[in-house]
């Protein structure tokens, strides 16, 4: 990349195939703090584990203070040339919004001034201008990826999401947003988002939801029938994760509070940063969560049947004790 006598080093990347084909991608929860000193280990370990990843999803709070150039510089330096070779799908978290003064006038909480200049994201119609390049969708080799902005204007996004999902013909559907549908951090809850968005997620049986915000790890699912302990069919798989050093305690009741919403908690962790590798191949989606040392901590497989229903298959190997 360059012009005249000024050129960057050589960078390789691969564009998507036009047809359905297998691929892998990375998913990170909040990086947020001590990005260069701590998060650099996570993103580099992730690349080492999945060097052919097609893209990486960053589920919000990439930095701690929205408008600070220094923090964004740390985020880009921590990933180094990985950011140049592996496209990012960034999600706006609450820390991507901070009060902004313009000519001495307080404009209230505004999206990071660097966001739209450093990320080139797909435009989305039928949405307020304030959501531009924070709510978008794309398809990749048979999968539809949808990024939501869980900070604001949820009702407008719900109408847009309904339309996108009603027209969706992709085999796999993945939604990513910052605030989790089912909170895992102590003292946290996002009831409005759940009330507005979950009925749509359930209606269209979105396959996978990738979230952040709670600085803990949680994986759960919505069974087709809560009382059926034999049938392994599910509606959706939900994950909350964290990749940076900031950590919270887990909810004392786990996800028991959310049982009326039809969700079950399968595995959790505290005080542990993770990166995730997701493999998509035909009717199979394989989800794996790794610790910074590359050790596998959690894994599960989804099998999409011909009628569009999903079966969840536990990992064949022992994953060890919960942290």
Model regions and ranges:
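Loop/turn elements at helix/coil->beta-strand transitions in domains of secreted/extracellular proteins
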Residues: 21-24, 51-56, 83-89, 140-144, ...
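Active-site neighborhood of phospho(di)ester-bond hydrolases with catalytic His/Asp-centered motifs
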Residues: 27-29, 55-61, 87-94, 148-149, ...
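Conserved, compact domain cores that house catalytic/ligand-binding motifs in diverse enzymes
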Residues: 21-91, 96-97
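Extended active-site neighborhood of metal-dependent phosphoesterases/phosphodiesterases
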Residues: 1-12, 70-169, 188, 196, ...
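Active-site-proximal segments of metal-dependent phosphoesterases and phosphodiesterases across multiple
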Residues: 168-209, 230-231, 256-258
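Membrane-interface helix/loop caps of multi-pass membrane proteins
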Residues: 22-23, 36, 94-98, 135, ...
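Acidic, histidine-bearing metal-coordination/catalytic regions of metal-dependent phosphoesterases
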Residues: 1-27, 32, 48-49, 271, ...
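A short, polar/proline- and glycine-enriched secondary-structure boundary/capping micro-motif
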Residues: 37-38, 114-117, 156-159, 295-303
């Amino acid at each position: 990349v360059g012009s005249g006598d000024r050129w960057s080093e050589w960078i390789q990347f691969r564009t998507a195939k036009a047809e359905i084909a297998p691929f892998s991608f990375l998913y990170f929860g909040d990086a947020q703090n001590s990005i260069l000193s701590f998060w650099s280990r996570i993103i580099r370990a992730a690349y080492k584990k999945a060097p052919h990843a097609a893209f990486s999803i960053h589920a919000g709070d990439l930095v701690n203070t929205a408008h600070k150039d220094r923090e964004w510089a740390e985020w880009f330096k921590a990933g180094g040339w990985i950011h140049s070779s592996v496209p990012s799908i960034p999600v706006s978290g609450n820390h991507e919004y901070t009060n902004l003064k313009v000519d001495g006038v307080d404009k209230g909480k505004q999206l990071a001034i660097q966001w739209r200049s450093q990320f080139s994201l797909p435009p989305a119609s039928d949405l307020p201008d304030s959501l531009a390049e924070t709510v978008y969708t794309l398809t990749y080799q048979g999968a539809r990826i949808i990024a939501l902005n869980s900070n604001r204007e949820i009702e407008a996004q719900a109408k847009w999401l309904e339309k996108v999902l009603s027209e969706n013909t992709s085999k796999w559907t993945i939604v990513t947003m910052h605030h989790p549908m089912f909170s895992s951090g102590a003292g946290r809850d996002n009831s409005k988002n759940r009330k507005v968005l979950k009925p749509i997620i359930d209606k269209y049986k979105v396959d996978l939801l990738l979230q952040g915000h709670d600085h803990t790890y949680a994986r759960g699912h919505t069974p087709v029938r809560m009382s059926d302990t034999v049938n392994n069919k599910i509606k959706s798989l939900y994950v909350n994760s964290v990749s940076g050093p900031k950590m919270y305690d887990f909810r004392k009741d786990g996800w028991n509070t959310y049982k009326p919403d039809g969700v079950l908690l399968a595995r959790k962790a505290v005080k542990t940063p993770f990166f995730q590798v997701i493999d998509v191949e035909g009717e199979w989606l394989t989800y794996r969560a790794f610790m910074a040392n590359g050790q596998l901590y959690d894994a599960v497989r989804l099998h999409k049947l011909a009628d569009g229903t999903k079966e969840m298959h536990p990992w064949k190997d022992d994953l060890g004790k919960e942290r």
